[in-house]
C-alpha cells in the first residue's frame, strides 16, 4: 500500500470541527471516489454529513465504521421518476441509460435539503457535490454556502462535455465533430461522444435541464478533480481558464491514497494470489470490463479465442458473461477465469501483472496507471472513448484493441495485438507506463507532490469560508 503524507488536522481544542456536507451521485464510479475524499477530510479533522437515499446507504458502511464520530448519513427517500422502476436508486441497476432520469429524480431533493440545512444545529460551511448535480450550485446560493463540484472524470472529458453542450446545433448537424477550441483540437465521431451528450440530444428536444446542470459546474466556487496534473496539465489549464479562477484542486489519483474504505480492498483470493505468485514478472494480462458491462456471447467467444491464440498468461474477471465451453480446460495453467468480485487494484499491483485489457472507465484507467500496467483499451460507452484517446494518443500508455459496445473483435487480430503488446513489441509503451506510474505516485506521496499540495490548498480554503 502506498504511504500517504497526511496533512495536519484542522480541529482545534476550543472550536467545533468544520462541518462539510457531501452529496455523491449514485453510480459506483462517481460515489466511491467521493467517499474516498470524504475519508481524507475526516482524517484532517472535518465532520462530514453525506446525503444518500436508502438504497445507497450500504456504500457508507466502511466510512461510518472508520469514522463513527465524524461521519453522519443524511438519508432522503429516493424521489420517483416515470422512467425508473420502483426500487431503482443506483445506475448499476439500470446501466448508463439511467443517468438522466436519476439526475432528474435527485433534483426533487432541493427543498428537503434546504429544510435539513435550516434546521441543523451546526449547519455545514460548504457543500461538495458530484458534477452530475450541478443544480446544487443554485441551492448553495440560496442557503449561503459555497459549492465545490467534484469531478470523478478527467479534465479532458470536462472540456469535451462543455464544448458539446455549448455547441448543440453543431453537434447535432456535424459528424465528425472538430473541437477547435480545445487543446490539440481533437476530432470525434458522433458515436464516440460521451453517452450523456448523445442521450441529451437524441430526445425530441434537448434535455435542457441536464445541459444546464453541467454548465452550472463552471460557476461553482471551487472544483475538485480525481485526476493528476501529470496526466493532463494542458486540459487542466484550459478548464481553469474557463472557470476564471484558481480554486481548482487536482487531488488524485485517489486510488493511490490507500483509503482502506473498501471492504477487503487489499486482499486477493488465496488461489488467485498463489497463481500470480507463480507467474513471471509482468507476464499476466488482467481482463475486466467494469461493474456495468456484460459481454455478448459473440464478444465472449471472440475474446476467448483471442486470448487463446495470444499464448499470453491472463486473468479474466467475469460476471454473467457466457464463457465458451471447454475454454478453461484449453487454457488451464496459462489462464484463469474468475467469477464474481475481485480486488482489482490489488491484482493490478501484483508484480506478475503487466497489462490491463479494459473498457477505459476513468476509475479503472487510474487504477491501471497507478499500477504501471499497459492498458489495452476496448472503449464501449459513456466517457470511455474520450479516456482511450487520452491514454493512447496523449499519454502513450495504452494501445487500442477494439471499439464499441456491440463490436465483435477479430480474434486473430486481437490475439496478435495482445501477444505483441505483452511481449517485445510492447516495451516502449511499457516503459512509458512505468514512467507515468512513478510520476503519479510522487504526486500523492512526496511532500511537494502536486496532489499533496492541492489537498492542503483545499483544506485551507475550507478553513477560510
UniProtKB/Swiss-Prot annotation:
Gene3D superfamilies: Glycogen Phosphorylase B. It comes from Arabidopsis thaliana. SUPFAM superfamilies: UDP-Glycosyltransferase/glycogen phosphorylase (SSF53756). It is an enzyme of class 2 (transferase). This is UDP-glycosyltransferase 89A2. Its EC number is 2.4.1.-. GO terms for molecular function: UDP-glucosyltransferase activity; UDP-glycosyltransferase activity. Glucosyltransferase that glucosylates benzoates and benzoate derivatives in vitro. It holds the Pfam family UDPGT. Keywords: Glycosyltransferase, Transferase. The gene is UGT89A2. UDP-alpha-D-glucose binds at residues 291, 342-344, 359-367, 381-384. It comes from the Eukaryota. Belongs to the UDP-glycosyltransferase family.
Amino acid at each position: 500500500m502506498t504511504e500517504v503524507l497526511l496533512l495536519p488536522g484542522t480541529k482545534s481544542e476550543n472550536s467545533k470541527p468544520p462541518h462539510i456536507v457531501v452529496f455523491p451521485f449514485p453510480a459506483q464510479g462517481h460515489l466511491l471516489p467521493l467517499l474516498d475524499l470524504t475519508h481524507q477530510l475526516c482524517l484532517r479533522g472535518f465532520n462530514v454529513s453525506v446525503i444518500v437515499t436508502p438504497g445507497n446507504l450500504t456504500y457508507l458502511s466502511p466510512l461510518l465504521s472508520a469514522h463513527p464520530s465524524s461521519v453522519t448519513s443524511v438519508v432522503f427517500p429516493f424521489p420517483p421518476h416515470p422512467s425508473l422502476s420502483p426500487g431503482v436508486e443506483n445506475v448499476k441497476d439500470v446501466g448508463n441509460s439511467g443517468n438522466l432520469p436519476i439526475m432528474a429524480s435527485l433534483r426533487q431533493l432541493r427543498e428537503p435539503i434546504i429544510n435539513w440545512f435550516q434546521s441543523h444545529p451546526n449547519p455545514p460551511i460548504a457543500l461538495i457535490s458530484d458534477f452530475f448535480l450541478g443544480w446544487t450550485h443554485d441551492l448553495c446560493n440560496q442557503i449561503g454556502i459555497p459549492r465545490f463540484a467534484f469531478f470523478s472524470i478527467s479534465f479532458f472529458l470536462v472540456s469535451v462535455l462543455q464544448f458539446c453542450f455549448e455547441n448543440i446545433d453543431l453537434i447535432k448537424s456535424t459528424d465528425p465533430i472538430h473541437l477547435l477550441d480545445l487543446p490539440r483540437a481533437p476530432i470525434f465521431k458522433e458515436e464516440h461522444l460521451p453517452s450523456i451528450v448523445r442521450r441529451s440530444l437524441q430526445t425530441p428536444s434537448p434535455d435542457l435541464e441536464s445541459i444546464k446542470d453541467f454548465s452550472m459546474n463552471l460557476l461553482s466556487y471551487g472544483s475538485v478533480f480525481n485526476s493528476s496534473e501529470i496526466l493532463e496539465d494542458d486540459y487542466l489549464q484550459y478548464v481553469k481558464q474557463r472557470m476564471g479562477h484558481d480554486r481548482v484542486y487536482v487531488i488524485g489519483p485517489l486510488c493511490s491514497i490507500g483509503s482502506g474504505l473498501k471492504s477487503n480492498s487489499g486482499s486477493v483470493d488465496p488461489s488467485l494470489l498463489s497463481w500470480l505468485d507463480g507467474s513471471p514478472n509482468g507476464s499476466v494480462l488482467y481482463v475486466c470490463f467494469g461493474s456495468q458491462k456484460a459481454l455478448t456471447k459473440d464478444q465472449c467467444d471472440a475474446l476467448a479465442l483471442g486470448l487463446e491464440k495470444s499464448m499470453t498468461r491472463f486473468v479474466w474477471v467475469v460476471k454473467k458473461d457466457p464463457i465458451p465451453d471447454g475454454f478453461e480446460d484449453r487454457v488451464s495453467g496459462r489462464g484463469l477465469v474468475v467469477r464474481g468480485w475481485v480486488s482489482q487494484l490489488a491484482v493490478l499491483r501484483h508484480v506478475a501483472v503487466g497489462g490491463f485489457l479494459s473498457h477505459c472507465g476513468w476509475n479503472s484507467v487510474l487504477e491501471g496507471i497507478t499500477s504501471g500496467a499497459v492498458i489495452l483499451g476496448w472503449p464501449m460507452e459513456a466517457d470511455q472513448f474520450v479516456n482511450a484517446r487520452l491514454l493512447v494518443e496523449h499519454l502513450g500508455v495504452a494501445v487500442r484493441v477494439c471499439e464499441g459496445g456491440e463490436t465483435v473483435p477479430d480474434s486473430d487480430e486481437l490475439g496478435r495485438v495482445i501477444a505483441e503488446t505483452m511481449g517485445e513489441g510492447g516495451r516502449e509503451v511499457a516503459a512509458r507506463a512505468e514512467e507515468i506510474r512513478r510520476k503519479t505516485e510522487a504526486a500523492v506521496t512526496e511532500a511537494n507532490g502536486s496532489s499533496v499540495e492541492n489537498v492542503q490548498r483545499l483544506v485551507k480554503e475550507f478553513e477560510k469560508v
